[in-house]
Amino acid sequence: MSKVGTSDSKNTLYCSFCGKSQHEVRKLIAGPTVFICDECVELCMDIIREENKSSLVKSRDGIPTPKEICKVLDDYVIGQNHAKKVLSVAVHNHYKRLNHQTKHSDVELAKSNILLIGPTGSGKTLLAQTLARILDVPFTMADATTLTEAGYVGEDVENIILKLLQAADYNVERAQRGIVYIDEIDKISRKSDNPSITRDVSGEGVQQALLKIMEGTVASVPPQGGRKHPQQEFLQVDTTNILFICGGAFSGLEKIISARGRSTSIGFAAQVLAPEDRRTGEIFRHVEPEDLLKYGLIPEFVGRLPVVATLEDLDENSLKKILTEPKNALVKQYQRLFEMENIELTFADEALGAVARKAIERKTGARGLRSILESILLETMFDLPGLEGVEEVVISREVVEGTARPLYIYADRSDRAVESSASA
């Protein structure tokens, strides 16, 4: 049994779980007869999160409830509540539909594939990746920009089903109940409204190829990839019950929506007259199928995506939360890097706000946060390994704005705060 240990000479306290001394950890929390360090507390929290994730509350059909799916999404994805609700309900209904079909074959429910529309860095891909972690079904992601029509250089559409089959360990039955996320779907829009003698093999051609597998067909899938092994036997995979989620930034779609608003006399026209004064995500809320057609998606393809969820631009508060709250938050990652040098990295709240505002100004969303932090911390990370006695580095708003340098706090408190290399 682990005992609370104290050094005979210095009365040093030790963690009752890992045995580290109070000098090796940041915090040592005292109980009636035991001590626990901050590292063990964090480890316990990780274990509890994993157990909660794996024990989702089930509905009567044995399917995770929409609220439970949404709750787990909340743990990883900041904001985008509407999109999370749409995804949670769609995934729940998808598997409820499959169970319903097996019990009542006389009633056939149509499949509702999903289209996610949102600005760059708003969380479309992260939502799909998080779904993969919380659902016990095969899941795969595909990049629409790599797809071409069969017979041309690039990936065949059937390769998407092959990846799903691989995710299911070649269990065809499981693969037929999986989920496919196709990213950058806006990049396969038709290049021109006018028919051309030049075949559009990566735009409209890919849309045509995707139609059948999205609606439901028996696809012949080569287990090793068809182009390199043409003589192999094909596996037959029915795509009727595979849920397809497509996502894209649809850059320029907001102009089409705004133009439609200016040409109509209905009430919401006044709301879109000045798109430069509004954020892209707000304009996306008013998207209609006709806007997607003008953007370059063919009518049949739009019809295969009946559920449209729009994501909003992330505001300053959401970006600040993204920096600090998720399990793998960027600030936590950089703090871990500094811990390897036995240095504590501290961000002032105003500094986090300044980082968020920079990302908003650049219109890069959450995707641009890492590059901003990297540029702020570059000189510090360059200097620190060669310095001795630095205990803490403090990042203020002025540091982010470029008007000051990070503060170095030394172990010798008589010279408590020293500006970085500028004062050296």
From Swiss-Prot:
Its biological purpose: ATP-dependent specificity component of the Clp protease. It directs the protease to specific substrates. Can perform chaperone functions in the absence of ClpP.
Residues engaged in binding Zn(2+): C15, C18, C37, C40
Protein keywords: ATP-binding, Chaperone, Metal-binding, Nucleotide-binding, Zinc
UniProt cross-references to Pfam families, sorted A to Z: AAA_2, ClpB_D2-small, zf-C4_ClpX
Protein name per the record: ATP-dependent Clp protease ATP-binding subunit ClpX
Subunit details: Component of the ClpX-ClpP complex. Forms a hexameric ring that, in the presence of ATP, binds to fourteen ClpP subunits assembled into a disk-like structure with a central cavity, resembling the structure of eukaryotic proteasomes.
GO CC annotation terms, alphabetical: HslUV protease complex
Binding residues annotated for ATP, in chain numbering: P119, T120, G121, S122, G123, K124, T125, L126
Superkingdom field: Bacteria
Organism: Bradyrhizobium sp. (strain BTAi1 / ATCC BAA-1182)
Protein family per UniProt: Belongs to the ClpX chaperone family.
GO biological process assignments: cell division; proteolysis involved in protein catabolic process
Signal peptide: none
GO molecular function: ATP binding; ATP hydrolysis activity; ATP-dependent protein folding chaperone; protein dimerization activity; unfolded protein binding; zinc ion binding
ClpX-type ZB domain span: 3-56
Gene this chain is encoded by: clpX
InterPro entries linked: AAA+_ATPase, ATP-dep_Clp_protease_ClpX, ATPase_AAA_core, Clp_ATPase_C, Clp_protease_ATP-bd_su_ClpX, ClpX_bact, P-loop_NTPase, Znf_CppX_C4
